[in-house]
Design a protein with these regions (language model features):
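Non-catalytic structural scaffold of enzyme domains
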Residues: 1-100
Length: 100
């Protein structure tokens, strides 16, 4: 079993609800959370700025050698998810799925 942690980030503290649910569903997994409270909220910022912040958040989490990253931020999930998936060699998941 891969014992590396799963990294989770949000633009603030709201993503702790995702961490709580992940811990409930996968109690054997180690989780690392980063809440970017210094720059919250991300909403209202340009797409380039959001993508830059998200890259920095992922870079920080990557320093812990995670096996996957969960973006617990709707703004980043809808703005930068595709970029982050392309730029990383580990799975990157968002919290906002496709809608009809």
């Amino acid at each position: 079993m891969d014992r590396r942690p799963i990294g989770v980030f949000d633009s603030g503290l709201g993503g702790l609800t995702a961490v709580r649910e992940l811990a409930r569903l996968m109690p054997e997994e180690d989780l690392i959370y980063f809440g970017d409270t210094g720059r919250v909220p991300y909403g209202g910022r340009s797409q380039d700025t959001i993508t830059t912040y998200a890259r920095q958040d992922v870079r920080f989490l990557r320093s812990f050698d995670p096996k996957a990253i969960v973006i617990a931020c709707g703004t980043v999930s809808t703005t930068a998810l595709d970029v982050l998936r392309r730029e990383n060699d580990i799975p990157v998941f968002g919290v906002v799925g496709p809608a009809v």
